């Protein structure tokens, strides 16, 4: 018998017709992991800590995580950009330490009726002021307006003309929740009522970061291609890097889960450079934003994760540059990084963003990887798209091999077996890999097929006759990053003048 059947026996005697199904040549699916956000829920929230929870909507996140909680805000920021993708969250216990505070000190007496516009992160709070209100009355109005919105990252108290905003959770993250007055300024109709003066100053510095080991354990072996991490301290980033590593982590040959971590940090140029220099991790993207960016760092991380998910799901090799971080408020004009400063950040492993017409957009999603094991400059893992493309290619190969050859026999090239037999040889697999490469070339994932074929090696293992060894040398397509023009102008071509 030449044809290999899976179920129909070769010695059946009962008439007549038998058929079995075989889907090994039908699979055209593309494997992709979901998104994951890690963060704090309210202390009285119903969500179980360190457990994977599927979140379908912002309202559901508010319900189970608590309004105003870090996770609820991150889900809200994520869904602004990716309203469709599959999203999970893991709530981590609040760290020991201190909750960050911000003080708004009110002075003067209102000589006109108006509104105080306080921005806590991206959200504007409007506190009414009546002519004749003194500092204490204005402070109470601000406090009441803040507490009337349960979705804010702060709660408020007031005393003797001073409003104290306290972050809902303890930890370093609270130091990166911006508070300002009149973000849009006079041109946007935001001015303080005459006679009222308000100063904004940092109070207690947030301290502490959660231990993420149990959260990592909760991830198990579920695939997550896009992981949003709000904690940018060294210990938290290194914990996630261990989970992602190539030896025993998600990128190892044993687990083959892949994925990429996105985090964010706001600060001065020197602060961001110092942060980038701490790491050399190809599976981590740390995006740096100006200190005056009017969006909390945790929401920036969630938004960038969402943008990557939307773009990379469609095409892993296409650059994420220009991607809009929907509804994220950038730093105001005059307080944004210059091109020179952006170049510095990108040279120190910090991903960048830019602003066009008031919209915050991705400039370049690099990883923190900069040097090889000897400390020599290495750009092999510079761009996150390279990692996403690698995951796509490896999953594609796995899909082809496991779908078509999951129960095949292995023989040497030149073996004279009958057509229809479930047997592969190195040459058969080589042809299959070449065909798959051609398909990916047409899809714009790889290039240079002829050179790929020249360097491709498929051979039977000399010590294990059941094993095929493959050297698979793809040439990934690249991204258009720089368009350089030498404008060699003339006042008039001499030929024309003649």
Locate the predicted segments by residue.
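Threonine/glycine-rich low-complexity segments that form extended coil/beta-edge repetitive scaffolds
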Residues: 20-21, 25-69, 79-140, 169-223
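Short, ordered beta-strand-loop transition motifs
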Residues: 96, 109-111, 156-164, 460-467
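A glycine-rich, acidic short-motif signal
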Residues: 65-81, 91-93, 187-327
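Amphipathic, non-transmembrane alpha-helical segments in extracytoplasmic/periplasmic proteins
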Residues: 137-150, 435
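Second-shell loop/turn segments in exported
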Residues: 125-133, 230, 418-422
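Short beta-strand-centered interaction patches in the first periplasmic/extracellular domains
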Residues: 146, 152-181
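Structured, hydrophobic secondary-structure cores that serve as assembly/anchoring elements
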Residues: 1-86, 322-327, 331-344, 349-498
